[in-house]
From Swiss-Prot:
Catalyzed chemical reaction(s): (2R,3S)-3-isopropylmalate + NAD(+) = 4-methyl-2-oxopentanoate + CO2 + NADH
Cofactor: Mg(2+); Mn(2+)
InterPro entries listed in its UniProt record: IsoCit/isopropylmalate_DH_CS (IPR019818), IsoPropMal-DH-like_dom (IPR024084), Isopropylmalate_DH (IPR004429)
Residues holding substrate: R93, R103, R131, D220
Site (Important for catalysis): residue numbering on this chain: Y138, K188
EC number: 1.1.1.85
Name the record gives this protein: 3-isopropylmalate dehydrogenase
GO cellular component, one term: cytosol
Chain sites annotated for binding NAD(+): 73-86, 278-290
Family: Belongs to the isocitrate and isopropylmalate dehydrogenases family. LeuB type 1 subfamily.
Keyword NAD in annotation: yes
């Protein structure tokens, strides 16, 4: 099992180093994994002039999974758009046809005070958002800005095919079947024909999953319900644009994006795994970044791409035990806790892995 490690930019190398320590621990226990580093984003631009160089493309194709730190930095803002670090991330997603984005939204009991919502509203929060990643209005054609009747007009095309909807629906139903058996599909079928088709295809697909309870919700109501009563949701499936917005909204229910992993999968469960936070150049090199989202992304990788459920669960339990022991990086620190840096947080997680 070959894993490409793409540390990226900003705090990426610091947080990746801690996730790599966790993976090497399992390697020493006998897990047959091979770890190979590569360049993506700004570091790749600096080294090769390209955000997604050919060597990284080959590595990504050959690897069974990819673990990413973060990409981006203000020093690259003056580059042509196609040379900016973020284009490397878009390119690797396209190259690998990663169409399913999975975002767990979990609030650890130890961090309940970090949420801006009342503890009784978010206690026990555990949602999985499944977002279609390669279609919808972000990629539909035609698109552009042009002159019509003497003025500029901007336009985009929201479009989905039956097959695109069906394949993401299967991912969501299967995920719900592994969890609590409830799936909510989010659309805007009352005004958008594209999402009427979405609802029709998801409803049809449900016939193959009799053990999963399907519900539908309009996106404006879903945005409201995520704040009003987020615990009503188990798995949520939606299109690219709605998922982009709702997953960011849901992530803030936990109080810290430094805790949240994500996965982007192809149709064979090969995936790109990464924390949802950015490269945080303002704290890069200070040794204070929270590595837990990257460590939890490694756990997702072991679960979804390698079917190593036991190892994944052990990592998650080690993270929770570390929080129970009151260790906190600066982003999740509160009075009375033990403030630690990036490396020491990694030390604590490893110690808890070893003391199972």
């Amino acid at each position: 099992m070959k894993i490409a490690l793409l540390a990226g930019d900003g705090i990426g190398p610091e947080i990746m180093a801690q996730a790599e320590r966790v993976l090497r621990y399992f390697q020493q226990e006998g897990l047959q994994i091979e770890l190979e580093p590569g360049l993506l984003g700004g570091c790749a631009v600096d080294a090769t002039g390209e955000p997604f160089p050919e060597a990284t493309r080959q590595l990504a194709i050959e690897a069974d999974a990819i673990l990413l730190g973060a990409v981006g930095g203000t020093q690259y803002d003056g580059l042509p758009r196609e040379k900016r670090p973020e284009q490397g991330l878009l390119a690797i997603r396209k190259e690998l046809n990663l169409f399913a984005n999975l975002r767990p939204v979990v609030l650890y009991p130890e961090l309940s005070n970090a949420s801006t919502l009342k503890p009784e509203v978010v206690a026990g929060l555990d949602i999985l958002i499944v977002r279609e990643l390669t279609g919808d209005i972000y990629f539909g054609r035609p698109r552009g800005i042009e002159y019509r009747d003497g003025q500029k007009v901007g336009f985009n095309t929201m479009i989905y095919s039956e097959s695109e909807i069906r394949r993401i629906a299967h991912v969501a139903f299967q995920a719900a079947g592994r969890r609590n058996g409830r799936l909510c599909s989010v659309d805007k079928m009352n005004v958008l024909e594209c999402t009427q088709l979405w609802r029709d295809v998801v409803t049809e697909t449900a016939q193959s999953y009799p053990d999963v309870t399907l519900s539908h919700m309009l996106v404006d109501n879903a945005a409201m319900q995520l704040v009003r009563n987020p615990r009503q949701f188990d798995v949520v499936v939606t299109g690219n644009m709605f998922g982009d917005i709702l997953s960011d909204e849901a992530s803030m229910l936990t109080g810290s994006i430094g805790m949240l992993p994500s996965a982007s999968l192809d149709d064979r469960n090969k995936g790109l795994y990464e924390p949802i936070h950015g490269s945080a150049p303002d704290i890069a090199g200070k040794g204070i970044a929270n590595p837990l989202a990257t460590i939890l992304s490694a756990a997702m990788m072991l679960r979804y791409s390698f079917n190593q459920e036991t190892a994944a669960s052990r990592i998650e339990h080690a993270v929770q035990k570390t929080l129970q022991q009151s260790y906190r990086t600066e982003d999740i620190y509160e009075a009375g806790m033990k403030k630690v840096g990036t490396v020491e947080m990694g030390d604590r997680v490893l110690a808890n892995l070893q003391s199972r």
